[in-house]
Amino acid sequence: MEKSITAILIKAEERKESDYLVRLFSAEGIVVAVLRGVRKAGAKMKFAAQPMAFCVYELTGNKFPVVTGASQIEDFSSVCADMIQFTCCMIMLEAADYSSAAVDCAESFLSLLRSIKTIIYSSVDARLAATKFLQ
């Protein structure tokens, strides 16, 4: 079964020699999948394994999906330049991960996306935006 999801990468854990086990947060909930070969030097999908990668992920497989393709929607890597912004965004990702079973994922996904964009693109204090997301 092939499907594509629009998701934000929450976490990537090393698996085998060059693979990552990733947790993707989408409007449908959390999806755990494998990104193959992205730890190699010339990997084409390396961008899709970065924290806060906002992409359309192409998945193949039912029980344990494998990411076969990804196209980036927006680049949130600029948040890494500011420690406070980065920390606030990572806290929001962790909160979204832990609360995904108890909340409406579609609403939570959109709220997370709005909060990350607020932190990156506006002059609002990152701590205030993160606190508002967590409420």
PLM features per residue range, with description:
Residues 1-21, 25-135:
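Non-catalytic alpha-helical scaffolds and adjoining flexible linkers that form interface surfaces
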